[in-house]
Amino acid sequence: MNPTLLSPTTVTQRLYRLAFALSLFTIVYNVFEGLLAMYFGWADETLALFGFGVDSFIEVVSGLGIAHMVLRVQRHPTSSRDPFERTALRVTGYSFYVLTAGLVLSAAASAWTQHRPATTWVGVIVSLVSIVVMSALVVAKQRVGRQLESPSILADANCTRVCVYMSGVLLVASGLYELTGWPYFDALGTLGLAYFAFSEGREAIENAASDKLCGCCHP
């Protein structure tokens, strides 16, 4: 059928299905990314990569809430956040706080002992792939959000953009360590991830008690 002959309702439903598919892909990708990053982070003794992997699993919880949000908005465009989404935000927020504490303490211990990872090449590869994939997801979610005129989906795109920033932190820290061998780069990268984790955690907790659209809606 010619797309120009589709009714506005049919086009809208297709766009919502695409938005839901994008949210599911984000969840699945984060699971695989988390497993890979945590495994090699542990094996290569790189805190930044391991912390990045833990963050990916926390993003899965957030992603479940976002997927649920897309379905809710599809059925009731003007509805407010429901208990499931608020619970997902709270779990996400407190998990980020725990991660922040762990990253800061680990980074301090690493800097004190001048710990040297065996290698950070996997961190370079994982972060590069993540930047490409997450950037593509940001563009796709923004396009769908604009077509649907949905602030919720546009907010989700902003959440995904934060993942690009965190991948950039991992890339810089991992790349500089491989180039220089300076032991503090891994610790500094870990602290950079801790900053974003704390920011996301704080916003998730605050937004769980409000009707703001997303737990990480940075401009």
Please provide the spans of the model-predicted regions:
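Alpha-helical transmembrane cores and adjacent cytosolic helix/loop segments
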Residues: 1-219
